[in-house]
């Protein structure tokens, strides 16, 4: 039996992957006359890639047939059950011809042209959306991790309802012919009350509401952004909502106070709201009365109504919050700091704004807080500022790609403060500092927007004032990210980037192709979409700066600040380095050397880390005998989630007598580099450990070896200065030492050490991971 379907038709997205369309399977099917076949006539879901298949079958020309490979457990309200006694089954030819005529009439109408045009537009928008997703996702594991984070816990199914007598009798009737009441009892029997003794029906437990996944976004000085940038940001916000990430936006008008500041904030909130509403299936909601503050104005503001705020977010609205609070005693509107507004919202979403009753049982109070935290998961704290990510003034990199707050916050804050103080000093901006500032990605913005002078001048100079303002902005963004993440679970993360970068990557391929300044063949990844899907920075922080251009889609090896100047931040984990390289630099002459039996090292946890990472048992005693007298240092990330053991190795034939000549020939060697399996590929654990090794502990270089078939070799290759296959073995040698190839003696020492190290695994197999 062929079953036609009337236009218009819509269906759930991504249910099949078959031939006619990449996402939808449409084809005609036949069913046996005595079987029930379920077909979709109309669904209230969003339309995705509507297509029709037309073919001739017998005398029924121009008839349309549809079949969908959909899940069997679709909701009943979108299913239509075609039974053998239906008119379609009794007189299929007549009905099919009528349906064909209706379809022909519909196809010739002007309304159909409008609908088809709308569908084509939707299809184009969907295509752009999926291209953005495909260009942002990196691996299948990351996609699975994203789906696992957003997957709702399944509701427990209740008892099946008791079947009514009428349904039971009807189900037992013979099928094939509609014989009315011939085989059944009279209507009076069916309609008469039935007295039975059953168990009392248990009321069905309420389904646990789905947890709201949320991104808190602060947009700085949107009044300085043109409409194309605002539209690009609005498009990205719409895509985030579509991917299951609700968006709450704080509008920061800058350093404007009083009535003018409130007016600017409201105008820009309306501007962003209008841009969001222009996106397909997107809605916005401006919430002016979101915050309250004490009359004295001390402390953070508080959220007036959690229910109003969450209900709008749960309904799929992009909520815009101007930094306006109302005083509690004598209600009046006052302008508050946008950072304070963002922190107040963070505190509310984290469930920490709850004021418990002192007389209440602590267990009850704790349960109340847990219930609040189950409602919302604040996954991302995003700062969109024209200054972009956090710049770096030390080391080879010009910006911080990833910041582990537990380890680096104080160091980076002090670094920015020192540069700011040097800018504002009486001597003026030195030539070196000025050159460093000019090499940073935000200098382009400063030169273009704020008219930085060509050469440093003595204070008070406009350039010095501008640089002070720029560095103050970076310090504020860094503090905001640190303070917000301190209130959130360790799984939450932050992003500091520019709205221009988000807007640029949100453009359609046609717009990108029309831009003459666009370079490269790949579509640029949207940092916000990429971070949502992967929970990683756009570029690995351990990647050498000279190689970042090859991985940012530009197709060249040049460093491209447009595609790399986004800072990804996490509350992170503490990093322990023994001995402390800042007080005791790691030198070959250092005595006495650290041993793995040292009380500052948790040896059982270190062994567990190694065995879990390599998936092999370690011969602990043999390993200690080999390395304890050679330890250069140990790096431990977090609670032994990752780590590295580094040694000083003497090349074969060189006496280890403690002399200067012997120490000069010693090779810095990475003996073990391990990350727990559950932390591999996420959280930046490997990057944190590797960066500490090559930037802090061994800045002059280190070497290691890996078997040729090790899947991690690609990661090693990208981060090393060179690699060398050891002939006659299954080994590859890697190093980060600059100029090693030109130093023949040192290169031979490196190779000899990598060949001579003996394994210490319990299985005694010469297969080294």
UniProtKB/Swiss-Prot annotation:
Under catalytic activity, the entry for this protein gives: L-glutamate + acetyl-CoA = N-acetyl-L-glutamate + CoA + H(+)
Q: What is its main location?
A: mitochondrion
Q: Does the keyword Phosphoprotein apply?
A: no
Q: Which residues form a coiled coil?
A: none
What is this enzyme's EC?
2.3.1.1
- GO BP annotation list: L-arginine biosynthetic process; ornithine biosynthetic process
Q: What is this protein called?
A: Amino-acid acetyltransferase, mitochondrial
């Amino acid at each position: 039996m062929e079953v036609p379907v009337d236009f218009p038709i819509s269906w759930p997205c991504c249910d099949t992957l078959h031939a006619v369309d990449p996402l939808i399977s449409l084809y005609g099917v036949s069913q046996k006359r005595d079987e029930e076949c379920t077909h979709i006539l109309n669904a209230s879901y969003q339309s995705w890639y509507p297509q029709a298949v037309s073919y001739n079958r017998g005398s029924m020309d121009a008839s349309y047939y549809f079949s969908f490979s959909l899940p069997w457990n679709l909701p009943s309200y979108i299913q239509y059950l075609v039974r053998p006694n239906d008119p379609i089954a009794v007189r299929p030819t007549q009905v099919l011809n009528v349906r064909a005529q209706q379809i022909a009439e519909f196809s010739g109408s002007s309304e159909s042209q409008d609908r088809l045009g709308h569908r084509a537009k939707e299809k184009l928008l969907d295509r752009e959306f999926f291209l953005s997703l495909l260009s942002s996702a990196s691996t299948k594991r990351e996609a699975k991790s994203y789906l696992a984070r957003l997957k709702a816990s399944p509701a427990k199914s209740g008892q099946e309802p008791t079947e009514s007598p009428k349904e039971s009798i009807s189900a037992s009737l013979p099928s094939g012919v509609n014989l009315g009441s011939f085989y059944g009892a009279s209507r009076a029997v069916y309609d008469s009350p039935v007295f039975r003794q059953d168990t009392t029906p248990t009321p069905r437990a309420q389904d646990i509401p789905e947890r709201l996944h949320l991104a808190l976004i602060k947009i700085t000085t949107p009044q300085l952004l043109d409409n194309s940038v605002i539209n690009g940001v609005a498009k990205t916000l719409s895509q985030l909502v579509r991917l299951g990430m609700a968006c709450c936006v704080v509008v920061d008008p800058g350093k404007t106070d009083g009535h003018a500041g409130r007016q600017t904030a409201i105008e820009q909130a309306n501007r962003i709201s209008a841009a969001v509403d222009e996106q397909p299936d997107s809605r916005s909601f401006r919430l002016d009365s979101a915050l309250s503050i004490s009359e004295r104005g001390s402390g953070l503001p508080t959220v007036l109504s959690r229910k109003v705020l969450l209900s709008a977010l749960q309904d799929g609205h992009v909520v815009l919050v101007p930094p306006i609070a109302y005083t509690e005693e004598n209600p009046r509107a006052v302008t508050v700091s946008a950072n304070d507004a963002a922190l107040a919202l963070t505190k509310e979403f984290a469930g920490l704004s709850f004021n418990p009753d002192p007389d209440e049982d602590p267990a009850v109070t704790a349960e109340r807080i847990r219930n609040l935290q189950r409602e919302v998961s604040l996954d991302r704290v995003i700062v969109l500022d024209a200054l972009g990510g956090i710049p770096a003034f030390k080391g080879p990199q010009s910006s911080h790609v990833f910041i582990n707050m537990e380890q680096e916050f104080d160091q980076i804050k002090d670094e920015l403060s020192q540069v700011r103080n040097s800018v504002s000093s009486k001597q003026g901006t030195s030539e070196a500092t000025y050159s460093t500032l000019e090499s940073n990605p935000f200098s382009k913005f400063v030169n273009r927007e704020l008219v930085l002078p060509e050469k440093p001048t003595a204070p008070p100079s406009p350039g010095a004032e501008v640089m002070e303002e720029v560095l103050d902005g970076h310090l504020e963004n860094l503090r905001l990210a640190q303070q917000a993440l301190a209130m959130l679970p360790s799984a939450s993360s932050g992003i500091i980037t520019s709205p221009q970068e988000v807007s640029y990557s949100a453009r359609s391929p046609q717009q990108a192709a029309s831009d003459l300044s666009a370079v490269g063949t790949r579509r640029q990844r949207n940092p916000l979409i990429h971070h949502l899907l992967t929970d990683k920075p756009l570029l690995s922080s351990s990647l050498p700066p000279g190689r970042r251009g090859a991985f940012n889609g530009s197709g060249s090896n040049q460093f491209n600040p447009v595609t790399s100047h986004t800072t990804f931040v996490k509350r992170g984990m503490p990093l322990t380095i023994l001995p402390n390289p800042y007080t005791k630099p790691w030198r070959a002459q250092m005595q006495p050397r650290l041993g793995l039996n040292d009380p500052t090292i948790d040896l059982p946890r270190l062994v567990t880390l190694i065995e879990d990472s390599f998936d092999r048992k370690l011969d602990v005693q043999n390993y200690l005998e080999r390395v304890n007298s050679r330890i250069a240092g140990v790096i431990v990330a977090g609670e032994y989630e990752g780590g590295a053991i580094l040694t000083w190795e003497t090349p074969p034939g060189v006496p280890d007598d403690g002399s200067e000549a012997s120490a000069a020939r010693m090779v810095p060697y990475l003996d073990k580099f391990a990350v727990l399996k559950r932390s591999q590929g996420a959280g930046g654990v490997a990057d944190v450990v590797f960066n500490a090794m090559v930037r802090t502990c061994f800045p002059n270089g280190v070497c290691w070896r890996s078997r040729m078939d090790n899947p991690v070799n690609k990661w090693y290759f990208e981060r090393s200065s060179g690699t060398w296959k050891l002939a006659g073995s299954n080994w590859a040698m890697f190093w980060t030492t600059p100029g090693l190839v030109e130093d023949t003696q040192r290169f031979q020492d490196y190779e000899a050490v990598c060949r001579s190290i003996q394994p210490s695994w319990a299985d005694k197999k010469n297969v080294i991971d």
